[in-house]
A protein has these predicted regions:
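Residues on the lipid-exposed face of transmembrane beta-strands in outer-membrane beta-barrel proteins
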Residues: 52-56, 87-95, 107-109, 143-151, ...
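Short glycine/proline- and aromatic-enriched beta-strand/turn motifs that initiate or cap beta-hairpins
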Residues: 30-85, 244, 250-252
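Outer-membrane beta-barrel channels and translocator barrels
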Residues: 45, 98-100, 152-156, 197-201, ...
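Predominantly the C-terminal beta-signal and adjacent terminal strand-loop region
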Residues: 183, 199-252
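Flexible, solvent-exposed loop segments that connect beta-strands
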Residues: 64-80, 112-136, 171-181, 217-237
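Structural signature of outer-membrane beta-barrel domains
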Residues: 57-61, 110-114, 166-172, 210-216
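Residues that define the transmembrane beta-barrel architecture of outer-membrane proteins
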Residues: 46-48, 83-87, 137-143, 157, ...
């Protein structure tokens, strides 16, 4: 229950922030006719343009267990009990394909961490809790490629949605732990945001959801052959996939 409460609280925080961003987009669209001329009326007619972004991201792991039971009757399960925000920074290249379509490439760096808790599922309720924890720090080089689909411009705002893929490479140094993960992964991504046209640049808050496609768990662990207490964690898992929520602020 403690894990569930933490996850629910974290999800509600992310949803609240996304709701605030969408409300800001809606309120900005309610400009009165004749207020003023539009900012940067020809900004979207450029064949290509550059920009950069900063933001936050939340990492999660989806564990699939295989039901493995140790010789002493333990059945270990793992989960991420809560989300810690990480920092991300990217550069942006945007290519105009059509009035409503843009191709965007935004390589960058994601810095973050997540905590994994592993518990013995078979222990009795009145027993002393048997568990292990592992803090995982990650430094990702990311290469997102997105198709941006924009709506009609409403004075100085323009809502949009995105879809694409993102390749990631974890370049941080790793030491031997109970769980080890592959350095490379590929994500499917989808998101939404809104362009705000300011006098000198466009400001775009965006929320993106990223779903990992590959099993990142290292199943072969010869380094733990002499340490069955740590090896049983890997043996208890069929696969592990990554998910992320990314909140980004673009300046173009």
């Amino acid at each position: 229950m403690r894990f569930l409460r933490k996850k629910i609280a974290s999800v509600y925080r992310v949803r609240l922030l996304a709701t605030v961003i969408m409300m800001a987009c809606g309120l900005s669209a309610l400009g009165r006719p004749g207020d003023k001329l539009m900012n940067r009326p020809y900004a979207d007619l450029k064949r290509w343009h550059l920009g950069f972004s900063v933001g936050l991201h939340f990492q999660d792991l989806k564990f699939t267990h295989n039901g493995f039971i140790t010789a002493d009757g333990q059945q270990w399960v793992a989960e991420v009990p809560g989300y810690d925000p990480g920092f991300c920074v990217n550069v942006l290249a945007d290519l105009r394909l059509h009035q409503y379509f843009n191709l965007r490439v935004s390589p960058g760096m994601y810095f973050g961490s997540k905590k994994v808790e592993m518990l013995d599922y078979n222990q009795s309720p009145d027993a002393i809790t048997t568990h292990m924890t592992q803090d995982i720090k990650s430094t990702y080089v990311v290469v997102p490629i997105d198709l941006k689909i924009s709506g009609n411009r409403l004075r100085d705002t323009r809502p949009y949605v995105t879809g694409g893929v993102m390749a990631t490479f974890d370049v941080g140094k790793k030491k031997s732990e109970a769980l080890m993960f592959n350095t490379a992964d590929v994500f499917l991504t989808c998101g939404f945001g809104c362009d705000f046209y300011l006098p000198y640049f466009k400001f775009n808050p965006e929320v993106k959801f990223c779903f990992g496609l590959t099993d990142i768990l290292r199943h072969k662990r010869p380094d733990l052959d002499d340490n069955p207490e740590m090896l049983k964690m890997t043996e208890s898992l069929a696969k592990v996939k990554q998910n992320m929520i990314v909140i980004t602020f673009y300046f173009e």
